[in-house]
Amino acid sequence: MLRLVPTGARAIVDMSYARHFLDFQGSAIPQAMQKLVVTRLSPNFREAVTLSRDCPVPLPGDGDLLVRNRFVGVNASDINYSAGRYDPSVKPPFDIGFEGIGEVVALGLSASARYTVGQAVAYMAPGSFAEYTVVPASIATPVPSVKPEYLTLLVSGTTAYISLKELGGLSEGKKVLVTAAAGGTGQFAMQLSKKAKCHVIGTCSSDEKSAFLKSLGCDRPINYKTEPVGTVLKQEYPEGVDVVYESVGGAMFDLAVDALATKGRLIVIGFISGYQTPTGLSPVKAGTLPAKLLKKSASVQGFFLNHYLSKYQAAMSHLLEMCVSGDLVCEVDLGDLSPEGRFTGLESIFRAVNYMYMGKNTGKIVVELPHSVNSKL
């Protein structure tokens, strides 16, 4: 049982465990921190979210870790969260951000059985857009070091891994279409499909991204800015594609449905083209969808990672093993090529979200949160 003991301005866990509240370099954890907070519901991230300063650093409970975030991941669905679409019952203000990687700087007594101060961990949990985040030890993932490449696996990698394994029915020789293939999750869908010995087609928005896809083994990159996707699919794949990993929505979804082979499967993991609209949806030809699916005995199925959490740890372990061994490319985009340079600090998350919705990123967008040992934040 935890016993909180007041010590001046803040409380720490029982004095015998006070050492857990010093970071691994020996500097005291500050009393205040910065974090992003959703203060109004809106799909416009800048309107919805505020950088809040002088927030109290949270205390870990008995089974928790306090993680000092070094890198956090940006996801297309961050603006769905800021718009209140995932849980309409939650009202502002609330924390935002889905994933982070950093060091354990404090922990509860039960959590200390498995973790130590200074240990590198990655996690998928709400509230990562902060300098410090409390994470249940049961859902944290130990990692060899604090590398942004490991962070790419938490949401983007596991989404591709679990959805394709559970819903894709991949096997040698099947044709797989991956939309937004050079993005955060598309890069993994592309590589995992190739490892299953499939023929992979990947859509992207530039020649540079096309070259990136080729470097990963993509059989047919399609730069939709210079080639009409529908025409390419009809001419080069007249029998259709067996599996589609779809994250764009709108017109791209319609093209993907039309390209399905007999008994083809389309997995919807998102529809980014509609997220910034008031409804969060992009128009599709829903009226003709039943007839098209019936004609081909095809299927469309959604995938939401939270519904497959029982598969998460096994997927994460396998992906991490592949990443560490060099068997999986985990491309990170830290914004070095963006007009204002690298995404550094919580305030740069606003730029990072815009960068993503402009389609500029190659790989997973990651924001670095620098830390000075002597910083008082």
Curated annotation (Swiss-Prot):
Its EC number is 1.3.1.48. GO terms for molecular function: 15-oxoprostaglandin 13-oxidase [NAD(P)+] activity; zinc ion binding. It catalyses: 13,14-dihydro-15-oxo-prostaglandin E2 + NADP(+) = 15-oxoprostaglandin E2 + NADPH + H(+); 13,14-dihydro-15-oxo-prostaglandin E1 + NADP(+) = 15-oxoprostaglandin E1 + NADPH + H(+); 13,14-dihydro-15-oxo-PGF2alpha + NADP(+) = 15-oxoprostaglandin F2alpha + NADPH + H(+); 13,14-dihydro-15-oxo-prostaglandin F1alpha + NADP(+) = 15-oxoprostaglandin F1alpha + NADPH + H(+). It holds the Pfam family ADH_N. Keywords: Acetylation, Lipid metabolism, NADP, Oxidoreductase, Peroxisome, Phosphoprotein. One of its GO terms (biological process) is lipid metabolic process. The modification Phosphoserine is found at residue 299. NADP(+) binds at residues 185, 205, 209, 224, 247, 269, 275, 303-305, 361. It is found in: Peroxisome. The keyword Acetylation applies. It is an enzyme of class 1 (oxidoreductase). The keyword Transcription regulation does not apply. Gene3D superfamilies: Medium-chain alcohol dehydrogenases, catalytic domain (3.90.180.10), NAD(P)-binding Rossmann-like Domain (3.40.50.720). CDD domains: Mgc45594_like. InterPro entries: ADH-like_C, ADH-like_N, GroES-like_sf, NAD(P)-bd_dom_sf, PKS_ER, Quin_OxRdtase/zeta-crystal_CS, Zn-ADH-like_protein. The modification N6-acetyllysine is found at residue 35. GO terms for cellular component: mitochondrion; peroxisome. Functions as 15-oxo-prostaglandin 13-reductase and acts on 15-keto-PGE1, 15-keto-PGE2, 15-keto-PGE1-alpha and 15-keto-PGE2-alpha with highest efficiency towards 15-keto-PGE2-alpha. Overexpression represses transcriptional activity of PPARG and inhibits adipocyte differentiation. PANTHER family: PROSTAGLANDIN REDUCTASE 3, SHORT-CHAIN DEHYDROGENASE/REDUCTASE. Belongs to the zinc-containing alcohol dehydrogenase family. Quinone oxidoreductase subfamily. This is Prostaglandin reductase 3. It comes from Homo sapiens. The gene is PTGR3.
